[in-house]
Amino acid sequence: NKPKPLTEETRKLMIRNEFGGINESFYNLYAITGDERYRWLAEYFYHNDVIDPLKELRDDLGTKHTNTFIPKVVAEARNYELTRNETSRKLSEFFWHTMIDHHTFAPGCSSDKEHYFDPKKLSQHLTGYTGETCCTYNMLKLSRHLFCWTGDSSIADYYERALYNHILGQQDPETGMVAYFLPLLSGSHKLYSTKENSFWCCVGSGFENHAKYGEAIYYHNDRGIYVNLFIPSQVTWKEKGLTIRQETEFPQEETTRFTLQAENPVRTTIYLRYPSWSKDVKVSVNGKKISVKQKSGSYIAITREWKDGDQISATYPMQIKLGTTPDNPDKAALLYGPLVLAGERGTEGMQAPAPFSNPALYNDYYTYNFHVPAHLRTSLKLDKKHPERALQRVGSDLKFTTEQGDVIRPLYDLHHQRYVV
């Protein structure tokens, strides 16, 4: 009750800063308890300057602080789920599509120095301070809400892209430390937190990210169960007495396999995501190929009576493609399936404590000088129509080479060295 005596002017002044997702937390408390005080508090943190333009379906993002917006829209999504406020749903969907279509880099991340910028100048913002991790963390959260409403496979496509290219590569595999930004500056490198001196916002969300890999693999409704991600896992659908075990080495391999355990024969539909990045998918049930009539960017629906021991195999061919920036066709990311590839560029000029943050400097992740050597080669010559001709895959790992001697690997797998996307 303490905020109630405050004037509307004071309320608006108080919430002008970045307060994160506290209103979402109050909506969740309202859902748990039914106490209207929590709903009132959630609505009290409604940020007019952020949400009102979105209610009008207007992109007024300008150069504002990116992560000030996203958690507040997540709260609106939660509001819709609890109150069926259609305005909250429409603005949430509008914001998501605006972000993905106009404000997102190839790895699925957004922002430059934490802020929006003119989407018509995206190629001019490939800096060492792109891709704040908190932004992607919250976009994935918003995506989970929207997918539950729509079942739209494009949402799952984005989720996979951001999960593999940004989140998976955000953590240093040697120390467990995490990165604030995902630098897209040619010749830069990832800059990690330290064990005792860094506690940025992206450390908090960064560690939470890596406990969430199981959150968005499977979804279900009255029609059936949806397989959105190709990650080794097991899910049990208690109401159906059905357990599905997924085994795969994706993305190192193109095939994923499912084994079903059924207490009793059960008729339902299993929806396998048909990603937009693949074509000519091959699916078999118990060793027999089935006809795939769906197109990429949808779901392959398999409806039948499932029995204990049934098996499904799905192979998703991956191709080398280019993802060009909207404002400059000569700047593009090299893609392999959903993965953004990057070229190794060694460690020249990297001096300790790099690639870790310098605790002696204030917010050095935000002012860091990457000291990119002037002679470092930052481009790759290839045929735009046939980029696959420039690369040769080496062995079973996701490693490619070029005639110029470049070594190219997934961006998520490049650590402790410079790279070029």
Tell where the protein language model's regions lie, with residue ranges.
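A surface-exposed regulatory interaction patch that couples sensing to output
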Residues: 50-65
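Short, surface-exposed beta-strand/beta-hairpin micro-motifs centered on an aromatic residue
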Residues: 299-301
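Short, surface-exposed beta-strand/strand-loop-strand elements in extracellular ectodomains
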Residues: 280-287
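Aromatic (Trp/Tyr) and acidic
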Residues: 16-37, 66-104, 115-273, 282
